[in-house]
Swiss-Prot record:
Gene for this chain: tyw3
Protein name, as recorded: tRNA wybutosine-synthesizing protein 3 homolog
Species of the source: Danio rerio (Zebrafish)
EC number in record: 2.1.1.282
Record's catalysed reaction(s): 4-demethyl-7-[(3S)-3-amino-3-carboxypropyl]wyosine(37) in tRNA(Phe) + S-adenosyl-L-methionine = 7-[(3S)-3-amino-3-carboxypropyl]wyosine(37) in tRNA(Phe) + S-adenosyl-L-homocysteine + H(+)
Listed Pfam families: TYW3
Keywords: Methyltransferase, S-adenosyl-L-methionine, Transferase, tRNA processing
Record-linked PANTHER family: TRNA WYBUTOSINE-SYNTHESIZING PROTEIN 3 (PTHR48418:SF1)
Gene Ontology MF: a single term: tRNA methyltransferase activity
Ranges for region Disordered: 213-240
Annotated family: Belongs to the TYW3 family.
Positions of transmembrane segments: none
GO biological process per UniProt: tRNA methylation; wybutosine biosynthetic process
Pathway entry: tRNA modification; wybutosine-tRNA(Phe) biosynthesis
Length: 251
């Protein structure tokens, strides 16, 4: 991607208003978002640290979209059963209890940059992460996981579950939130290990992963610069490193 186009997109995205319901970046991931946006080759386009929500939808309506739902309760932290019960009392349709894990969308300058970020996400436990390339050349890396939870609680305002089962669901959702926050922390640590300058000492403890990040970072740096004086043996060694890295992304 052309450097000027990428920088223009980055400036436009970071300077526009936040149209989310909350209107700001979630506190638990603000350090991650700030770190990514400080990098020349990345910027975030949307994010959510993870949330527990209770929403009400129109009964017998197959089109369950945000515009057809009302939020009865939402938190980005662990929740209490009393909060869910109070929200459920407001239901006039079909209430659903849901946990949504951390999600982050990052626009990347080059495909190699997205591949590096993808490796970080996978190693941090976000196994559903992926890369998309748009028609205009926009490269988006989405950090996602699959440990969601979605359970219907009422139909036509009639509650379908007992208080005991509701208490169980709240406990499950809170456990998922705890695991979600641990994965965010791992992602933050892996991210800093992968993107910090080459000369700085890496604080990430897993040596194998450091090697992967170092190799991928080296490939990214070598995209625009080729050493014409490189001898045959060095070229062969670098080729083996690139093949090794490519195999990692096929696993």
């Amino acid at each position: 991607m052309d450097g000027d186009s990428f920088q223009q997109w980055k400036n436009q995205c970071l300077n526009k208003c936040d149209f989310s319901k909350k209107g700001s970046v979630d506190e638990d991931i603000s350090h991650v978002v700030s770190f990514i946006n400080s990098q020349d080759r990345y910027f975030t386009t949307s994010s959510c640290s993870g949330r527990i929500i209770l929403f009400d939808a129109v009964s017998d309506c197959p089109d369950v979209q945000k515009q057809n739902c009302s939020w009865l309760f939402v938190t980005h932290q662990k929740c209490q059963m009393e909060d869910v019960v109070r929200g459920l009392e407001k239901s006039v349709g079909d209430a659903t209890f849901k946990f949504e894990p951390f999600v982050l969308h990052v626009q990347c300058k080059q495909l190699e940059d997205a591949q590096l970020l993808h490796t970080v996400a996978i190693n941090s436990g976000f196994r559903n992460s992926g890369i998309t390339v748009g028609k205009k050349g926009k490269i988006i890396m989405a950090v996602r996981s699959t440990h969601c939870l979605e359970v219907p609680l009422s139909h036509r305002s009639h509650v379908l579950v007992t208080h005991q089962y509701l208490d169980f669901l709240v406990g499950v959702a809170n456990q998922k939130m705890e695991e979600n926050l641990k994965r965010i922390q791992r992602f933050s640590e892996c991210l800093q290990a992968a993107l910090q300058p080459q000369e700085e000492k890496c604080s990430f403890k897993e040596a194998d992963n450091k090697t992967v990040y170092r190799r991928r970072r080296k490939r990214t740096q070598d995209v625009s610069v080729t050493d014409s004086s490189q001898n045959t043996q060095e070229h062969h060694e670098n080729t083996e490193e690139e093949i090794d890295c490519d195999l990692l992304f096929l696993l």
